[in-house]
Amino acid sequence: MGMIVNLYRGYENEHSKSEFLKNADSADIFKIMMGMTYEQFKYQNLAWTIQNFCRNYHILIGSPNINREKIIDINQITDELFGLNVDELLAVEMMILWLCSQNPSPLTASEKLYNRSETGVITKEAIEKVVGYYSVTYKDVRNSPIGKQIFYSKPFVKTDKTQENIMVSFYLLAMTFADGLYWLMRDYYRNNNWGQKFINAFGEMFEDYFEELADTYLDEKQWFKIPVQNKKSADYYVEFDNAILLFELKSGLLGIGAKQQVPDIQQIDTFYKRNILEAYEQLKNSEEEFQGEKQILKIFLLYESATNMQIIMASIPDIFINDKGCYIMTIEDLEMLLATYRNDREKFNKVIYTLLNNENSEGRCESVLKVLGDYDAIGDMHFIGERDYYTNILERFKNCFR
């Protein structure tokens, strides 16, 4: 750890005027590494994109157990923006993905490649509308407060000279497909000055999804929502044979400026404050309330999709080094954990035992994902069968050519 700190300080002394690195301790270095690895880990394995797509589709459209009364029907939004319903939009987006796998300029492709039916929705006009929505100009990029990170939401650039829409990166296009439904709604609300309404409503929908998962994998007597009291508490209580898990749910996402090679430290600090530091006392209060014979694990459950939680934990040592029973878990981690509980109880018990007896220390933290991986308890476990929306949409896409 000391070597990493010294290398960073040496680089900073030669190349940077940043005061942050001049005074960085090991926790600060991990904070910087969190931003760097967040971006790199996403690029190294795109399997997460299918899971994210299915989860977003399930919460915003697919599940009958999610209360969507506080949000606008997403089909209304896609019709207003593109003249398409959601499934038609997704079919068009799949075609754009395929076209871009052949050529980075999809609008130059012959319409004969994709429009093979008089009643089909995959038309040149539809593709132009969707590509146009996800495009920016050079000027947009230059003036963007988040710089090149704008390509995460707008993965096409429209050239000045030829007015051609060119894909910046296939990885970024795939990422846009994965999270596109969520950001389509969130951006629509923001553009109409209703941004906080969607964020608040989605937080409640995230709770609905947690309860749906609990109903799917657990006995009804194993879990409950902790009643709101004068003393702030965690959100949910879940009991197993060998442990109690307390969950504090956080649907807020890490700012895009924090997810890059030179991360915005202020955005990281804001995310930590809102989603971890302020919520820690709530988990502690509930731990005191439910203290008994069984050991307790305190879980910050994030909707944020990330595979570098061990680095985030190492960057907040006051909590995750000093409190051995505290973890950050992504919603995908929870899906795999609960599926393992139902499918392989012995494997599940080993995971819980390891989490209860962790030996986190400065510079070394084990995440829930790492422990799940150690016991071969990872994979596409939840979004299968009727919940495999990606395959279902893909079949509809194929039908356009039959």
Model-derived regions: residue spans:
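A short acidic/basic microdomain associated with nuclease active sites
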Residues: 215-239
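Composition- and surface-driven signal marking solvent-exposed, interaction-prone regions
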Residues: 226-228, 233-234, 260-262, 311-316
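Conserved catalytic cores of phosphodiester-cleaving nucleases, focusing on short active-site segments
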Residues: 214, 236-238, 243-251
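Short His-Asn-centered micro-motif
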Residues: 226-227, 301-305
